[in-house]
Amino acid sequence: MTKVTTDVAALILRLAAGAIFLPHGWSKVAGEGGTAAFAADMATNYGIPTFLGHLAPWTELVGAILLIVGLLTRLDALLLAGTMFVAAFIVQLPEALYEVPPDAIKSFVVLRAIELPLAMFAACAAIVLIGPGRVSLDALLRVEERFRALLPKKKAAAEAAALV
């Protein structure tokens, strides 16, 4: 794969994921009861801490915008991947297993319940791995280069580890 195709793939993934997350995040933030209603539902029905119930909608909404423009992309995609992992396996999967109609094919019902959060988890994981690409604010502002400059150099890290 060439650098250009990787950049195009990253752009397509970012735009598609952002376009999907944006209305989902907005509906939770601006919907009836806002994040408080969403957080209460997550705490009551799924045992998810209220703080995370408040954080998830904002992660989806702000994360969508950051993905689309390609700013803080790897961190953003990592947070969104975590949110989608919880959505797929803690919220959707148990509910699907519990509420399968008697005449339904169980595996299809379960897959259908988790397919969107699972696909979004995969998209975000791919973005974490390939990065934002050159068509992003991260590339324009050299965010990843600046972050790497803050990290200890390999030699210094090895020397520090040898002291321990």
What feature does the model see in each segment?
Residues 42-44, 67, 128:
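Short polybasic/polar patches that bind polyanions
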